[in-house]
Swiss-Prot record:
GO biological-process terms attached to the record: regulation of cell shape; regulation of Rho protein signal transduction; regulation of signal transduction
The protein's name: CDC42 small effector protein 2
Tagged with keyword GTP-binding: no
Example GO molecular function: small GTPase binding
Organism the protein comes from: Danio rerio
Chain's gene name: cdc42se2
Cellular component terms (Gene Ontology): cytoplasm; cytoskeleton; plasma membrane
């Protein structure tokens, strides 16, 4: 018994090439609009405990522009010491 292969080109669609993301350079980025600086928050500020997180949230809400309703968020953090001792 012999094999017979028949190819139907009409049924096979060419796969579209994935679009490459356009590279952004500094000239494409404009100045911020309606920017209001309210606080400095560093990575170490969040690891000092929940009192610090609440303090930051209260400070930012007191500056305005964060909506009328306060948003309640549960924050769980795990601190992992990566220093070789």
């Amino acid at each position: 018994m012999s094999e017979f292969w028949l190819c139907f080109n009409c049924c096979i669609a060419e796969q579209p090439q994935p679009k490459r993301r356009r590279r952004i350079d500094r000239s494409m980025i404009g100045e911020p609009t309606n920017f209001v600086h309210t606080a400095h928050v560093g990575s170490g500020d969040l690891f000092t405990g929940m009192n610090s997180v609440n303090s930051i949230q209260n400070q930012m809400q007191s500056k305005g522009g964060y909506g009328g309703e306060a948003m309640s968020v549960n924050v769980q953090m795990q601190l992992v010491d990566t220093k070789a001792g």
